[in-house]
Regions:
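NAD(P)+-binding Rossmann beta1-loop-alpha1 motif at the extreme N-terminus of oxidoreductases
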Residues: 1-57, 185-186
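A short helix->loop->beta-strand "cap" motif at the edges of active sites that frequently abuts
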Residues: 26-27, 82-86, 106
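Rossmann-like NAD(P)-binding element
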Residues: 53-81, 87
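ADP-ribose/adenylate-binding Rossmann-like module
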Residues: 82-96
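Rossmann-fold dehydrogenase core element
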Residues: 87-90, 100-115
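Internal alpha-helical scaffold of NAD(P)-dependent oxidoreductase catalytic cores
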Residues: 99, 103-107, 123-161, 171-211, ...
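NAD(P)-dependent Rossmann-like dehydrogenase/reductase catalytic/cofactor-binding core
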Residues: 199-269
Length: 269
């Protein structure tokens, strides 16, 4: 089976090098194409570097890792070259299956990885159009399992799923950046040490919850004893943070809606 990746941006590059390093795909079965060929020359040692149409004609699974505004042009470019039974995989939640079908009507999946794929712990969202059978789903899931866990959702839930896994590293980093900055104003502990302490505690808390099957409330109850210091802090968080979380999702989901509208307009041109 031959795997192809069109686009050598952050996600395309990550997938290429992860697929190469897992040892399951030979160099001659891994293809990469990019609009600027010079940018992808560094991959010549691990993959076949070629143009979009050659990649589409040779590969059984074709990942398209380009911006929404470029998607229609790329799909139009490769439409006549795709194999009849190839699986097209897009990495953009704003592009719907209905949009894609206007250009090319093939088996299609949408995949949304997370930044944590870099350490093989991605929570990767995937959804499929009605042409994809169980065998293709199994093949793609096995391929994506090399970068973490695969979570299948219906297309209408991909947006919120993306917020929870793909956007979440940025949300989490922002939240704990605020906490560390606030802590710095109350202590002589160096900022670098504060960050390390918080990161290690955050990571260990997540592992503890997963390994012991604890809920958030379980952890809060165990740490925030009645009348204690931690309880004072958790009260503030539960009183004040819900409005910030609601506004965060309102803003991001609205931006996602507007992005989808722009993408739809580009497919109607």
């Amino acid at each position: 089976m031959k795997i192809g990746i069109i686009g050598y941006g952050s996600m395309g590059k990550m997938l290429l090098w992860k697929f190469s390093s897992n040892g399951k795909i030979a160099k001659e079965d891994l293809y990469i194409a990019n609009r600027t060929r010079e940018k992808v020359l560094e991959a010549e040692g691990i993959a076949v570097v070629c143009d979009n149409c050659t990649l589409a004609s040779e590969c059984d699974i074709v990942f398209v890792c380009v911006r929404p505004v470029d998607m229609k042009a790329v799909l139009s470019d490769i439409a006549a070259s795709l194999k009849a039974d190839s699986l097209l995989v897009t990495l953009n939640g704003s592009i719907t299956f209905d949009m894609i079908r206007k250009v090319v009507d093939v088996k299609t999946a949408k995949v949304i990885p997370s930044l944590t794929a870099e350490i093989d712990r991605s929570q990767t969202i995937v959804c499929y159009n009605d042409k994809v059978g169980s065998a293709d789903k199994t093949v793609l899931s096995e391929l994506l399992s090399s970068i973490g866990e695969v979570i299948e959702l219906p297309e209408n839930e991909v947006g919120m799923g993306s917020e929870l896994v793909s956007c979440m590293p940025g949300f989490i980093a922002s939240i704990f950046d605020v906490i560390c900055n606030s802590a710095e104003g109350h202590t002589e502990i160096p900022k670098e040490q504060i960050v390390k302490m918080v990161l290690n505690t955050m990571s260990a808390t997540g592992d503890l919850m997963l390994q012991k099957d604890l809920s958030f409330n379980d952890v809060v109850t165990r740490v925030a004893t009645k009348g204690g210091i931690t309880e004072e802090g958790t009260k503030v968080i539960y009183d004040m943070f819900p409005s910030a979380a609601d506004e965060m999702f309102n803003k991001t989901l609205e931006k996602r809606r507007l992005t989808a509208e722009k993408a739809a307009a580009s497919f109607n041109e």
